Amino acid sequence: MFSTLSPSAIDDILRHAVHFGQGTTAIAPSPVTFISTTTQQSLGATYPGVFNPTTPTFNHYQHQALPVTMHTSTSSAHHTTTGHGRGRRKNSTINLVCVVCGDQAFGKHYGVNACNGCKGFFRRSVWHNRQYLCRFEGRCAIAKEHRNVCRACRLKQCFVAGMNPRAVQSERVEREQNGSPNQIEEDDYKDLSSPDTCSVEIQTDVDEQKPSSNNSAPLPSMELEMAKLSEQIVEMHRAVCSYVDPVTKRENFDMKMETETTKIAFMNAFYNPEMIGPRTPLDITGRRVATVKDVMDEWKRNFVLFSDWLRALPEYNQMSIEDQIVLAKNRYGTFHWWMCANWTVQAGCEGVCYSNGAYFPKQPEAQCIPDVKGSSGRMYDSLSIPIKELNLDETEIVLMLAVIIFSDEITELADLTPAGKEHVRMVGNRFVRMLHHHVNSKEYGEAMENGDDTQNSSESQAAVRIAKMMILLSATTNLVYLTSDNIQLMEVLHVVPSEYLCHEVQFIQNSYETP
């Protein structure tokens, strides 16, 4: 568990990154290989199925994150041209990052911020319909220093980042009409001559590099890549929700809490969630009305789930420790309400369903704690009922949770560093694209079954559905402010027994305060 790890081991885990030096081999290792053996054993014992390096979910999903926050080298800052014209001076106040490899970008190419190297690589791959094979099962990390190591994973990353192959085809038609079908810009091969990239051995096998024909296989579909990533984050979600501490560990924690009350700093609690509470099995039944103890136990269990969920997400681990804490402090409340709202739909109870078999009723006379602001009724009406009407599937629920975590409200995340703000914005947009592809595919299938084979109709249905889901985002945020008011009023009016105020309520209140 994290409490038994040294500070250096924790930094090792949270700051893991893949770095290649000059003359290194072509194998892109797992980030787990940079963690000490002792640390791996501790993580394997504490989080089997999530942090275990042998777990398919960890290995597979861990390598899908884009290194969008990597710093570029000094040499890349001296380029003064763009992909749209020669001799154009770069605005020194703009620091765009290529969403594929993390190098410096000079503008948007095919729909995303991309460097000239990735722009040319993507265009050549689409024009010539090139097929690549990865020797390492598609698990290579793509970064500026070694982006040529694996063309297969680099092309896949281009699709995942949102590059549009239709824009490439349109450009080719335009060039052919202008009488220069084979014209190639010099920046197409700029990345091949860069000292930062030429020292790395190319390990990718090329299946097909001939011009495309009617019989050639199609390029990997963006929709297929998005669907694959969606499946992987759902697997991660299931693994985190299914983890349970041993019974002896839970009993020892209960005995300890009976004799100790202490104020725990948010940062310590987040990186050591076992200090807050044990990982009990999630009991989503709502079979009994909640007591005061049930309410406080729910906050603790949900916080442990929140900590496990965020720290299992590669996109979150790419942030600095400072930015991680800022984001976590501002997202605990939204995470809690989104999970409870979906549990309420699953259990079918009229109130706020908890993870311990209890529910907090929306009727005032049945409440163990006065709901001064009516947050339980607000959650039921503004979240649970719309979720039930939309009939969200598991993938939509998980992707919406990721969108909620990485929503970039300026006022809430003002304390993030500039790099952190850009990372949150880019990752949030990527999760929105994943949600759009999933919803569009789902709605299109239903339209086909109903005899409506028009793509425009499907996209229209998907847009309406996503718009309704985005409304739920604002409803979740509103509930956070109501909850904060409730906690402050409970403490002032002394409506909660003092033994709970010493630890749980104080900690909950601290989670809404800025660093």
Swiss-Prot record:
Residues 498-509 are annotated as: AF-2. Gene3D superfamilies: Erythroid Transcription Factor GATA-1, subunit A, Retinoid X Receptor. Widely expressed at a low level in many tissues including the pharynx, sensory neurons, intestine, spermatheca, hypodermis, and excretory cell. One of its GO terms (cellular component) is nucleus. Disulfide bonds: none annotated. Residues 95-170 bind DNA. It comes from the Eukaryota. Residues 169-195 are annotated as: Disordered. SUPFAM superfamilies: Glucocorticoid receptor-like (DNA-binding domain), Nuclear receptor ligand-binding domain. GO terms for biological process: autophagy; lipid metabolic process; regulation of DNA-templated transcription; response to starvation; triglyceride metabolic process. Disruption phenotype: RNAi-mediated knockdown suppresses the longevity caused by an eat-2 mutant background. Residues 225-509 form the NR LBD domain. Belongs to the nuclear hormone receptor family. This is Nuclear hormone receptor family member nhr-62. It comes from Caenorhabditis elegans. The lineage of its organism: Eukaryota, Metazoa, Ecdysozoa, Nematoda, Chromadorea.
